[in-house]
């Protein structure tokens, strides 16, 4: 009986993307999986779907299939010798798999029954400036796979047992014939039904359908380290996805997003504060109160202080998240020029300019001043 076109088997077009092929395979394999579908012919249908996906999901195999069809290339390489061809296109394993089939060597396959650690997960956590600076405790809710509560992660319906896999007869592998440069070769692949374990369920768990896991919202308490900065992360061991075959759970990585402060600017462990002072304070000097992370302190402004002058308060910054002391607090001075002053203040400023030997060409600051000078004939 002639094989059906692989694209037809999966119900996709020949221009289908990898994602479209994967989506079609998942839908069909779930529909015809022998553990779920007990109808006559479902077993053969599942084999056909698995075979089609194995070829179309691999770029080299797919290109070979598109060019030569099911039978592979005929007549070798058309007299071109090896010609630098990519031999991985013939069966997907290249020379290594070919000679493995003859001599029993080649790559060592990972034991499918060996314990495997679960996948690591990542969660982005937004915290305030104060929570990051001083540390805090917060509870988060994430959606993740956990061991099925019905079968306790076994995947089988409670009260039932595992049986020898009907697809591979308990070997955990199936034989696959491949067209290679050395002719038609039989190789072994991991069984797609039992994933190499050699066993399948008498009856899959009705809750998780044999997966052994279910997706749930889980609440987790997170300790925000004192001094944590934007984009830094912490690892919560064992809070990731469940392991397989008795393997440990994966880890959960918390990545922090720190909201900016309305008062300070942060650069690592250092913080910056912009302080506005008047012309009089800058000229004569003063003592002013400035905020820090832990209350206010008095700062001495020397006479003659200029805009952009910077004062440094040692160890008044943020505690280093790794425990390497504290950063500094930098005070940036901004001398503010008044926009509204009285006539008396103007008179004093003119007098100051005269004493200093300055000749001013005063300019009106608004329409009212312009009108006043116009009617005075100035």
UniProtKB/Swiss-Prot annotation:
Stretches forming CXXCXGXG motif repeats: 148-155, 165-172, 191-198, 205-212
Family named by the database record: Belongs to the DnaJ family.
Binding site for Zn(2+) 1: 148, 151, 205, 208
Pfam families xref list: DnaJ, DnaJ_C, DnaJ_CXXCXGXG
GO cellular component, one term: cytoplasm
Binding site for Zn(2+) 2: 165, 168, 191, 194
Annotated ranges, domain J: 5-69
Note on how the cofactor is bound: Binds 2 Zn(2+) ions per monomer.
Keywords: Chaperone, Cytoplasm, DNA replication, Metal-binding, Repeat, Stress response, Zinc, Zinc-finger
Domain notes: The J domain is necessary and sufficient to stimulate DnaK ATPase activity. Zinc center 1 plays an important role in the autonomous, DnaK-independent chaperone activity of DnaJ. Zinc center 2 is essential for interaction with DnaK and for DnaJ activity.
GO molecular function annotation: ATP binding; heat shock protein binding; unfolded protein binding; zinc ion binding
Protein name stated in the entry: Chaperone protein DnaJ
Subcellular location(s) per record: Cytoplasm
SMART domains: DnaJ
Cofactor(s) this protein requires: Zn(2+)
The organism of origin for this protein: Staphylococcus saprophyticus subsp. saprophyticus (strain ATCC 15305 / DSM 20229 / NCIMB 8711 / NCTC 7292 / S-41)
Subunit structure, interactors included: Homodimer.
InterPro entries: DnaJ, DnaJ_C, DnaJ_domain, DnaJ_domain_CS, HSP40/DnaJ_pept-bd, HSP_DnaJ_Cys-rich_dom, HSP_DnaJ_Cys-rich_dom_sf, J_dom_sf
NCBIfam families membership: DnaJ_bact (TIGR02349), PRK10767.1 (NF008035), PRK14276.1 (NF010869), PRK14280.1 (NF010873)
Matching PANTHER family: CHAPERONE PROTEIN DNAJ, DNAJ HOMOLOG 1, MITOCHONDRIAL-RELATED
Main location: cytoplasm
Signal peptide bounds: none
Any one biological process term the GO annotation gives: DNA replication
């Amino acid at each position: 009986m002639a094989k059906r076109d692989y694209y037809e088997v999966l119900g996709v077009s020949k221009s289908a993307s990898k994602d479209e092929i994967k989506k079609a395979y998942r839908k069909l394999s779930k529909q015809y999986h022998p553990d779920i579908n007990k109808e006559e012919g479902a077993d053969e249908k599942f084999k056909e779907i698995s075979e089609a996906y194995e070829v179309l999901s691999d770029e080299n195999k797919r290109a070979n299939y598109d060019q030569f069809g099911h039978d592979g290339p005929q007549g070798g390489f058309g007299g071109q010798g090896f010609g630098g061809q990519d031999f991985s296109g013939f069966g997907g394993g290249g020379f290594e798999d070919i000679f493995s089939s003859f001599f029993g060597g080649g790559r060592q396959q990972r034991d499918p029954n060996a314990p495997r650690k679960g996948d690591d997960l990542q969660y982005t956590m937004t915290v305030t400036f104060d929570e990051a600076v001083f540390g805090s405790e917060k509870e988060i809710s994430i959606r993740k796979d956990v061991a099925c509560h019905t079968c306790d992660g076994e995947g089988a319906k409670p009260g039932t047992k595992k049986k020898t896999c009907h697809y591979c007869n308990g070997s955990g592998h199936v034989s696959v014939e491949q067209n290679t440069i050395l002719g038609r070769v039989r190789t072994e692949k991991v069984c797609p039904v039992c994933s190499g374990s050699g066993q399948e369920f008498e009856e899959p768990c009705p809750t998780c359908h044999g997966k052994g896991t279910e997706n749930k919202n889980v609440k987790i308490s997170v300790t925000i380290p004192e001094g944590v900065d934007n984009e830094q992360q912490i690892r919560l061991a064992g809070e990731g996805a469940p392991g397989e075959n008795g393997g440990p759970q994966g880890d959960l990585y918390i990545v922090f997003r720190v909201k900016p402060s309305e008062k300070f600017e942060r650069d690592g462990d250092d913080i910056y504060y912009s302080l506005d002072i008047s012309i009089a304070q800058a000229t004569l000097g003063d003592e002013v109160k400035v905020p820090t992370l832990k209350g206010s302190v008095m700062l001495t402004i020397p006479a003659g202080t200029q805009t952009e002058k910077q004062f440094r308060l040692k160890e008044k910054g943020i505690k280093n998240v790794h425990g390497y002391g504290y950063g500094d607090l930098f005070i940036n001075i901004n001398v503010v020029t008044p926009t509204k002053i009285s006539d008396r203040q103007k008179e004093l400023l003119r007098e100051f300019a005269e004493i200093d030997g300055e000749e001013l060409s005063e300019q009106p600051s608004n329409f009212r001043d312009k009108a006043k000078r116009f009617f005075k004939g100035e």
